[in-house]
Amino acid sequence: MKILVDENMPYARELFSRLGDVQAVPGRPVPAEALTDADALMVRSVTRVNEALLSGKAVKFVGTATAGTDHVDQAWLQQAGIGFSAAPGCNAIAVVEYVFSSLLMLAERDGFALRDRTVGIVGVGNVGGRLQKRLEALGIKTLLCDPPRAERGDEGDFRSLDALVQEADVLTFHTPLYKEGPYKTQHLADESLISRLKPGTILINACRGPVVDNAALLKRLEAGQPLSVVLDVWEPEPDLNVELLKRVDIGTAHIAGYTLEGKARGTTQVFEAYSAFIGHPQQVALDTLLPAPEFGRITLHGPLDQPTLKRLVHLVYDVRRDDAPLRKVAGVAGEFDKLRKNYQERREWSSLYVQCSDAQAATLLRQLGFNAVHHPVR
């Protein structure tokens, strides 16, 4: 049994070798010759999986180690009798922590308290739901927009997108990419919406590039109308608009979900799905794969305020480390993908063990995802 895995899927060789012969290949593009006799293909979001890629091939199963699936033609796979699995929620924590790192950087730079801001979350699924909980743990007001969930009658106070535009100080997008249909999200933030954003609004897109009309966004920024913009995803990729990058506050190479934990979850989820598909189900404990974190433990004295939280967050991950490299190579062919391929290891907040002298600080840090304990000073 021959299994092709994206060369940038951590632990893929180690896990899938339990099931067959593993060959690691580039994801953009996947070499055609490697597909000739492959039984299974494991990809990331850079690989377009469709009839053009797999027609006439022996592949019987496709797994994507990503939460999003817009790069996979699932209808064709089903028609062709090819099994499929994704990894929903695998990188949700990573994206939430990317958003927090960005907001805390902007808050420090511009001198505002996050508790004085209202955050509008568009798309309240694996990412948006976790973001809501962490923001509200800090006492930050959130407004939620998720039309599919609202129409299903799901629990939650869902508002219209127009209401968020009018009332929110931060607008952050966490939707799938749907190019058509009743819940179309392509250019959900279109020229009309972007023109109505209040001066000083913080706009964040860490889901899919075409959810925000990049041309319309550049038009507003070129007009000198004040917005703070955080973009991890672009329209198009990998050939992003360099002029837009010059004008955003934070720009990164589609890496918001790129924690080691998030990528490992993606690999283990598709491994477990494929092992079940071939009739040999196996389970993997994530902590048996992950290495020890760079920082073993730290001690926090006193209560948790915003500057202290910012230092803790940026100790684990400072978004500026990914902004600068993209600006250096923007516009150079192939460099966007190189940044993703050679991405520096990044961990989640749970990897940081924090001993807190203050019990409330320990409780709050745990709610935010840190590995925190109350350890009174004696």
Curated annotation (Swiss-Prot):
HAMAP family: PdxB
PANTHER family: FORMATE DEHYDROGENASE 1
Taxonomic lineage from the root: Bacteria, Pseudomonadati, Pseudomonadota, Gammaproteobacteria, Enterobacterales
Statement: the UniProt record of this protein carries the keyword Cytoplasm: yes
Role according to the record: Catalyzes the oxidation of erythronate-4-phosphate to 3-hydroxy-2-oxo-4-phosphonooxybutanoate.
GO molecular function: 4-phosphoerythronate dehydrogenase activity; NAD binding; protein dimerization activity
Record protein name field: Erythronate-4-phosphate dehydrogenase
Gene Ontology CC: one annotated term: cytosol
Subunit structure and binding partners: Homodimer.
Active site, per annotation: 208, 237, 254 (proton donor)
Domain of life: Bacteria
